[in-house]
Amino acid sequence: EMVDSLILTGSSGLFEESMGNSFPRRGDKDYIRTKTEEVFYDPKVATDELVDKVFAIANNRISVLKLLGYAKSAIRHNMGEDIPNIDKEVCLIWGAEDKVTPPHVAEEFHKLLPKSELNWIPLCGHAAMWEQPKRFSEIVLEFLKK
């Protein structure tokens, strides 16, 4: 009742799997660089400065525990049964080349959310608001004007 509409981008909640041994590998900066680059369509977006920040987070015990908690929660509570009950307008914004939360997840969200619109950003990975901020903002503003 307090929410008029939603904007979701690269969202989790469906199809989460165990992280296995993929995260976090503390102290391995090359691994952190590779994983950071995978977030973007253009790996050059993963600058040395950004990789340093991600590396610091991956080596901060409190941050890692929080991230693992979020990941475990997403694995335990699949939202597939709850999502169709959302009766609000929803703007889905997805990077067309998202490897973290692939396009088929966007399609499933769109199918399950009765009042959703799905917006693709081409040549864009998981962090659409970062990699394509102008187009991302245009989509958000168009949605908010409705």
Task: Give the predicted meaning of each segment.
Residues 26-88:
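Conserved alpha/beta-hydrolase catalytic His-Asp/Glu region
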